[in-house]
């Protein structure tokens, strides 16, 4: 925090997480200023100015529970917005919205803090040439490639492998790109946050013996926090990611789980501040709030922030203003399918539902585009034939269709892959597959060069050479 002794005011009114604070004439703090209120437990409460009410009063939203606060207590202006620690010392640690460590691992020694409210990079600093961000995951790189500095929506219900996919991406960016990740837990269950932390320690993404060798920093503002904290925790995570991009000049992965909760918290705060609601009861500032966050996630000439955002769709209604506003910012969508997970095909990324604006000639190579389209056509045809197979059996199909089905089943299995972070579950060592290897493998399958191999040879392998070697052992 910025330590200055500028202005002091007094709490005038408390309504849940919203406080009115009165200042002496001419000393009103600007909007988004952080104020600190000392509390009897000695921890203190940080609040953020949201409105100037006139009569020398401001209305602020608290970042923690206001239980026990009284009228008349002193509020000190901290001389700027909420500021949080940044840099290598944040790796392996869990922070709350105001940058305090909450993992009971002691204090964090940091050299620098940055305010969470900052301008998006200027147009002159942006990297304008679109480039692919290689993840080493076959199904993603081939069919719905991520843009470097882009925004990806991750859709999936409970238990289909979102967490494992997130951890594999964190692992791969560290190994292949020398990058780091920041995970922002926004308004999700505390149990999930704890499980993720434990799994990260288990899989080596967080190194407990030497935190600075960890690959990720975590920022949590979970369901039990007041709406002010949930609304700002995404900005805290983003600020930490921006430092790695702008100062350390690294490629950064920023995970936001869940972007819908960011909107939901904004809606709660808006209602508490007495603003007139807009469509479906959301805040009137929905588009600008979302834009302020998303515009800062981008590639500059120095480095990139690629963001993967889990998207909860309320009542499965894609036209709801919250997901609809999010979609406007996304470059790619990764949809996880329960049917594939039930078949044991992991990662359970749906090859037909997942999309990317990067999959077009001129951005990807002609060969890549062609093979991706052929894979989708083959899988689509297989999907159409499944009803006929279920009723009449595969023998009733034409020779051509039987060949299509055989190849589609091989493609489906070849889209599975053993993950580094899931070695304990699969018993297979993890594999990073380059885009070149991926294209080569699928080309061979679809051209019929491997028609004589059994389909189980393609299941949970890395590149095509491993599938051929596995087929030898199956003979």
UniProtKB/Swiss-Prot annotation:
Keywords for this protein: ATP synthesis, ATP-binding, CF(1), Chloroplast, Hydrogen ion transport, Ion transport, Membrane, Nucleotide-binding, Plastid, Thylakoid, Translocase, Transport
GO cellular component labels:
chloroplast thylakoid membrane; mitochondrion; proton-transporting ATP synthase complex
Its localization reads: Plastid, Chloroplast thylakoid membrane
Cite the GO molecular-function annotations of the record.
Answer: ATP binding; ATP hydrolysis activity; proton-transporting ATP synthase activity, rotational mechanism
User: Which reaction is this enzyme known to catalyze?
Assistant: ATP + H2O + 4 H(+)(in) = ADP + phosphate + 5 H(+)(out)
Among Pfam families, the record links this protein to: ATP-synt_ab, ATP-synt_ab_N, ATP-synt_VA_C
Tell me yes or no: is Phosphoprotein among this UniProt entry's keywords. Answer: no
Under which EC number(s) is this enzyme classified? Answer: 7.1.2.2
Annotated residues for binding of ATP: 156-163
Q: Which residues cross the membrane?
A: none
UniProt subunit comment: F-type ATPases have 2 components, CF(1) - the catalytic core - and CF(0) - the membrane proton channel. CF(1) has five subunits: alpha(3), beta(3), gamma(1), delta(1), epsilon(1). CF(0) has four main subunits: a(1), b(1), b'(1) and c(9-12).
The protein's job, in short, is:
Produces ATP from ADP in the presence of a proton gradient across the membrane. The catalytic sites are hosted primarily by the beta subunits.
Give the family from UniProt. Answer: Belongs to the ATPase alpha/beta chains family.
Q: What is this protein called?
A: ATP synthase subunit beta, chloroplastic
């Amino acid at each position: 925090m910025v330590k200055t002794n500028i202005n002091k005011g007094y709490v005038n009114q408390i309504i849940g997480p919203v406080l009115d604070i009165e200042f002496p004439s001419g000393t009103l703090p600007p909007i988004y200023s952080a104020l600190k209120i000392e509390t009897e437990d000695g921890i203190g409460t940080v609040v953020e100015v949201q409105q100037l009410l006139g009569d020398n009063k401001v209305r602020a939203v608290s970042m923690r529970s206001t239980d026990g606060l009284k009228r008349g207590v002193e509020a000190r202006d901290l001389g700027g917005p909420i500021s949080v620690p940044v840099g290598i010392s944040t790796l392996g640690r869990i922070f709350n919205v105001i940058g305090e460590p909450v993992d009971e691992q002691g204090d964090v020694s940091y050299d620098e803090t940055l305010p969470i409210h900052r301008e998006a990079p200027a147009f002159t600093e942006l990297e304008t040439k679109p480039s692919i961000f290689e993840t080493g995951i076959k199904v993603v790189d081939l069919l719905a490639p991520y843009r470097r500095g882009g925004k990806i929506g991750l859709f999936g219900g409970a238990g289909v492998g979102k967490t494992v996919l997130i951890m594999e991406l964190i692992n791969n960016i560290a190994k292949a790109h020398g990058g780091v990740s920041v995970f922002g837990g926004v308004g999700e269950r505390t149990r999930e946050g704890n499980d993720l932390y434990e799994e990260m320690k288990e899989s080596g993404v967080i190194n407990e013996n030497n935190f600075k060798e960890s690959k990720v920093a975590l920022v949590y503002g979970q369901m039990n926090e007041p709406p002010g904290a949930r609304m700002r925790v995404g900005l805290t995570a983003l600020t930490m990611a921006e430092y790695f991009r702008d100062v350390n000049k690294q490629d950064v992965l920023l995970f936001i789980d869940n972007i819908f909760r960011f909107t939901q918290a904004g809606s709660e705060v808006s209602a508490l501040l007495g603003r007139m609601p807009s469509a479906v009861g959301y805040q009137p500032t929905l588009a600008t709030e979302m834009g302020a966050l998303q515009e800062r996630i981008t590639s500059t000439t120095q480095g990139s922030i690629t963001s993967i955002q889990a998207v909860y769709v309320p009542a499965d209604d894609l036209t709801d203003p919250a997901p609809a506003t999010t979609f406007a910012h996304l470059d790619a969508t990764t949809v996880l399918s329960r049917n594939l997970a039930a078949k044991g095909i992991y990662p359970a990324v749906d090859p037909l539902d997942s999309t990317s604006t990067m999959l077009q000639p001129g951005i990807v190579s002609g060969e890549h585009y062609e093979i991706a389209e052929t894979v989708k056509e083959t899988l689509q045809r297989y999907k159409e034939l499944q009803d006929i197979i279920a009723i009449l059996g595969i023998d009733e199909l034409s020779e051509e269709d039987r060949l299509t089905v055989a190849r589609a089943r091989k493609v489906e299995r070849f889209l599975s892959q053993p993950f580094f972070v899931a070695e304990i579950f699969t018993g297979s060592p993890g594999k990073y597959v380059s885009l070149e290897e991926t294209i080569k493998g699928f080309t061979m399958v679809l051209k019929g060069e491997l028609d004589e191999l059994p389909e189980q040879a393609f299941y949970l392998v890395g590149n095509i050479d491993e599938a051929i070697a596995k087929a030898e052992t199956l003979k």
